[in-house]
A protein has these predicted regions:
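Bacterial signal peptide processing site
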Residues: 19-21
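A short, amphipathic beta-strand motif
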Residues: 32-42
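Extracellular beta-sheet/turn segments enriched in Thr/Pro/Gly and aliphatic residues
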Residues: 133-150
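C-terminal motif of bacterial Sec signal peptides marking the signal peptidase cleavage site
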Residues: 14-17
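Acidic, glycine-anchored loop motifs typical of Ca2+
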Residues: 118-123
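Tryptophan-paired
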Residues: 64-102
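A short beta-turn/strand-edge loop motif at beta-sheet boundaries
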Residues: 42-49, 63-64, 95-96
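Sec-dependent signal peptide recognition
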Residues: 2-8
Length: 150
């Protein structure tokens, strides 16, 4: 009897681990591609081609809370315009703090961490987002969102 129970328990554990693996794979498969095109005129030469684009999310109805990083991508470019593709996880709303419901509206925006002039610091002499033109809002439902740079 003990052997039968032990065999059933081991079989159950093996089956459960297979089910968990399938859930993990399906969650990965459900990630959404979000494309952002960075456009503008660069007055300076791009000496450092490597940078990082970060996608943030913040609840629409909550004021004065820090945004949550939901995806990031490293990129390389020598010229403008350029495009980056984020892999937005299917469960990205569960990452947002403070916690929100799946039905809550979320505002998405992008930021750059890019020392484009290669002087060792990210500052106003680099290619930066042009907030005077528009806030870098990202619409995850559209084919491509455009962000202005200067």
């Amino acid at each position: 009897m003990k052997k039968t129970i032990a065999v059933l328990m081991v079989s159950s554990l093996a089956f459960m681990s297979c089910m968990n693996q399938q859930k993990t794979n399906s969650a990965d498969a459900e990630s959404t591609k979000v494309t952002v095109e960075f456009v503008g005129n660069s007055n300076g030469e791009i000496k450092n081609k490597a940078g990082k684009a970060i996608l943030f999310a913040v609840p629409d109805q909550v004021a004065d809370v820090p945004a949550t990083e939901v995806a990031s991508v490293n990129f390389e470019t020598r010229s403008l315009p350029f495009t980056v593709n984020f892999d937005l996880p299917a469960n990205h709303k569960s990452l947002i703090k403070p916690e929100i419901k799946d039905t809550d509206r979320v505002h998405y925006y992008v930021s750059l961490d890019w020392d484009s002039d290669g002087n060792g610091t990210v500052d106003s002499t680099d290619v930066v987002i042009d907030y005077d033109q528009a806030f870098p809002t990202v619409d995850i439902g559209s084919a491509t969102s455009r962000v202005m740079l200067k």
